[in-house]
Amino acid sequence: MDGAVMEGPLFLQSQRFGTKRWRKTWAVLYPASPHGVARLEFFDHKGSSSGGGRGSSRRLDCKVIRLAECVSVAPVAVESPPEPGAASFRLDTAQRSHLLAADAPSSAAWVQTLCQNAFPKGSWALAPAENPPKLSALEMLENSLYSPSWEGSQFWVTVQKTEAAERCGLHGSYVLRVEAERLTLLAPGAQRQILEPLLFWPYTLLRRYGRDKVMFSFEAGRRCPSGPGTFTFQTAQGNDIFQAVETAIHRQKIQGKAGQGQDVLRADSHEGEVADGKLASLAAPLELPGSPPALYSEPLDSLRIPPGPSQDSLYSDPLDSTPARAGEGTQLKKALYWDLCEHVQQKLIKAKLTDPKEDPIYDEPEGLAPATLRGLYDLPQEPKDAWWCQARVKEEGYELPYNPAMDDYAVPPPRSTKPFPAPKPQGLALSESGAATGSGSQGHSSDTALYSQVQKSGASGSWDCGLSGVVTDRTGAKSEGST
């Protein structure tokens, strides 16, 4: 029969229908032996573990944890402990995570004993040994300045189905390690105790990250080894992962600023040495006798100017104050640009006498040629309200000439009046010869109209076809009209 290494009361957190609650159990830890594997068993009460864990009472469902499947054992802090003064710790396996709690001394003892049996070859000791072994002269110690001060933490997660996860072939449970400069996804090996790195995401290539009560998610950039996309992990430690990532990014920013400050100090010291002349100048390259100096044999700032006839500047002294040299005579009294003006004038005269050459096609760059004058009909204007203008010139007040004497604009000229119609022709007059054949009256002149009066009949309401009313004939006698 197997002997228990440790046993005692433990609180086990369970979740049903979205509600978390603590359940008090009796836990028994068995080591690895020829009769069985190392395991942790849970019972309802203390009496159930008698007889090597084969009690008659009912055992809790699926509450046997094999330590070979254990990934990590670490103390954690919870918001609502099962009782005051209780300390919690998490036991992660390849399938799920278990949250356990006990009083503070018992919780530390459980963590230490579980680490001893689950990781026999690992560094599970929480406290330093009482008698540390003496180091020999040949052994080497790690440099604390070189090794990172923050090792990071590991979390057991389950990959959710996303486009990026399917592209990378991720499914199932993995271990997500939060390191100093990146996130690393570890896959348990064949022995379930060795974690193999599968993917990693540097913090500088993460676009965004966030957490929820039951998951942790981040969006990777296109330069990540996994490619762009969103990765979602189901875990109850989403808040812990988020805080660990945030702390790592903050540490990386501080280290980056410190590195930039050291670079600035180095650059300043280098410039100071150059300014003080402490840097030794490089010796000039040796030249073979008789060989001409190459064009690029020396740097630009160290090229030597060949000695000229005179080192004086052209405008170092005024023209009048330049002393005349012997043998030059009175030729130096000419103006400075005298020869230049004559040379230009001769060129202009020759250009006028010779035939002008045809201008090249690409005389001026595009966009710099002078704009051509627009013609009269280049900008036509569409006439509007032509029916209103009626082909008359539109004259407005501000377009008329201004008269300064009257402080007003000139009045437009009057328009031509409407032409009067021609006078109607007069009635036909009888000639004197016709008058003789008449009634024989000579009293009236021939200017009398033939129809002098036309009266409207009131009784019948119609016009007479002849003379209705009294008609005066040529003799001067009035007669009644007859129809």
UniProtKB/Swiss-Prot annotation:
Q: Does the keyword Cytoplasm apply?
A: yes
Against InterPro entries, the record matches this protein to: Docking_Protein_DOK (IPR050996), Dok1/2/3_PTB (IPR037751), IRS_PTB (IPR002404), PH-like_dom_sf (IPR011993), PH_domain (IPR001849)
Coiled coil (UniProt feature): none
**Comp. bias (Polar residues):** 434-460
Question: Signal peptide location in the record?
Answer: none
Record keywords:
Acetylation, Cytoplasm, Nucleus, Phosphoprotein
Report residue spans for region: Disordered.
293-326, 409-483
| PTM annotation (N-acetylmethionine): residues | M1
- Compositional bias (Pro residues): 411-424
| UniProt-listed Pfam families | IRS (PF02174), PH (PF00169)
**Which residues are reported to carry the modification Phosphoserine?**
S48, S269, S291, S416, S462
Q: What positions are modified (Phosphotyrosine)?
A: Y296, Y337, Y362, Y377, Y398, Y409, Y451
Q: In the UniProt record, which is one GO cellular component term? A: cytoplasm
Q: Where in the cell is it found?
A: Cytoplasm; Nucleus
One Gene Ontology biological process: Ras protein signal transduction
Q: Which domain of life is it from?
A: Eukaryota
Q: Which PROSITE patterns match?
A: IRS_PTB
Decide whether keyword Transferase is in the record: no
Q: What does this protein do?
A: DOK proteins are enzymatically inert adaptor or scaffolding proteins. They provide a docking platform for the assembly of multimolecular signaling complexes. DOK1 appears to be a negative regulator of the insulin signaling pathway. Modulates integrin activation by competing with talin for the same binding site on ITGB3.
The subunit structure is: Interacts with RasGAP, INPP5D/SHIP1 and ABL1. Interacts directly with phosphorylated ITGB3. Interacts with SRMS (via the SH2 and SH3 domains).
UniProt lists the family membership as follows:
Belongs to the DOK family. Type A subfamily.
* Name of this protein: Docking protein 1
- Species name: Bos taurus
Q: Which gene encodes it?
A: DOK1
